[in-house]
């Protein structure tokens, strides 16, 4: 099974229960954050480590985009990277792709864009 590197910002991660894949989750909202782009609503800390004690969760960079978490993973694990890594946002299934498409492609062994053209 492919390894999941997940960048989460105030996301519900219940969907991960269905996938036995090894993973790491970078919690971008571990210290709190903003609910929207205009910084009008402050979010409390996500407490993902308490919500999901079985998950492998670490603090993400609250100032960077999801790509900063992916690069952190690559740099920190450069000498021992998994054979295949899926770089995901915490809301991938609910926002970017339908679950049935995700299930069909998620353990591919070659580059596969995670997109669902019919979902938009």
Question: Which ranges hold each PLM region?
Answer:
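ER/Golgi luminal nucleotide-sugar-dependent glycosyltransferases, focusing on the catalytic module
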Residues: 1-120
């Amino acid at each position: 099974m492919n390894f999941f590197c997940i960048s989460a910002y105030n996301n519900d991660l219940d969907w991960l229960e269905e996938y036995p894949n090894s993973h790491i989750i970078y919690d971008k909202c571990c210290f709190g954050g903003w609910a929207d782009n205009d910084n009008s609503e402050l979010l409390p800390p996500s407490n993902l480590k308490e919500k999901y004690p079985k998950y492998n969760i670490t603090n993400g960079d609250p100032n960077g985009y999801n790509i900063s978490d992916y690069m952190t993973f690559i740099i920190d694990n450069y000498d021992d990277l998994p054979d295949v890594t899926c770089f995901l946002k915490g809301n991938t299934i609910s926002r970017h792709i339908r679950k049935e498409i995700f299930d069909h492609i998620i353990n591919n062994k070659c580059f596969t864009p995670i997109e669902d053209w019919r979902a938009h």
